[in-house]
Each structure stands twice: as structure tokens, then as C-alpha cells.
Amino acid sequence: MIAKCGVKLDYSKSGITSHVSSSVTGGDFDFNDISDTFLTLAALSPLLKTPLSIHGISHTRKQETDRVSGMVNQLKKIVDHVEESDDSIRIVPDGDFFKKAINKPIEIETYEDHRFAMSFAILGSFDLLGNNQPWLRIIDPMCCTKTFPNFFKTLDFCRTKVENGQ
């Protein structure tokens, strides 16, 4: 799935190294069998150069929260064009809209759902404005401690490895 978007992963004994093409694209993906992970790809959609369609996710409306509507509501704070149906979402990223819209950190609601906190934290770790300033604020980020107590420590470790060129 991520290879189709333009990301190549190399696996070794020391870990996983990702190689991202200069033009990371969206696509059309069925998440029915891996529905818990749709939030991560959807949250990363502002990084894409082309539209992203995710379907097979209607049953996620009945989890900790209505994950489809919740994701759409949060993405509308970042992306100009997001469509929702019973079973899908479609996101049309626009980097220019996104960068113009940020004059203070965008607040992301987690709905006390760990997957929202973790998915948007990954997006927030990117320095999209190129000024090394926070541009995303996650409300109740620690709701993820019930499933991944060291998530933010691990994310910070991964970022440190990238920033140091390792």
C-alpha cells in the first residue's frame, strides 16, 4: 500500500529505513481488512500530491468513536477538500491551502481515541512549514497510553534518528 504511494521500505537487522519519493501520491485503497490503520494514512494525506480515497471503513463508525466522521472533521482543519460517505472518505490535498491556513497551531481533537492521537502525532512530527515550529496541537495526546504507553518517546526517538541522518 505505501509502495503504491511512493514510499519504499528497507528492512534490516537494525530496523526499517524508509525512502520517500519527491512526489508521494494518494490512490484508492480498501481498508476493510485493516480498518484500524486507515486513520494513519488519512492523517498523513496532507503530505500527498494527489487525492486519496479510502473505503471499506463503515464499521469503524461504531468503535471508540465514529472514526470516519471524526477523521473528516479533523482533516477539514488542515485540508480544503474532504468528502465523506457511509463507507469511505476522499481527501484532496492542497499544500498551498494548508500552508496559508496555519498562523497558529491547529488543534486536533482525539475523541479520547488513541488512534487519532497517534496518527496525527506522526503528521505533526513533519516540519511542513520549514521553520522548525510546532504547527499541530493534539488535545489529550496521552489517551494513547492505554495501548502504547511509550508512543511519544518512540516517535521522538524515530525523529532523532532521521534528523541525525541515521
Task: Report residues per predicted region.
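Short, structured segments at the rim of ligand-binding sites
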Residues: 1-166
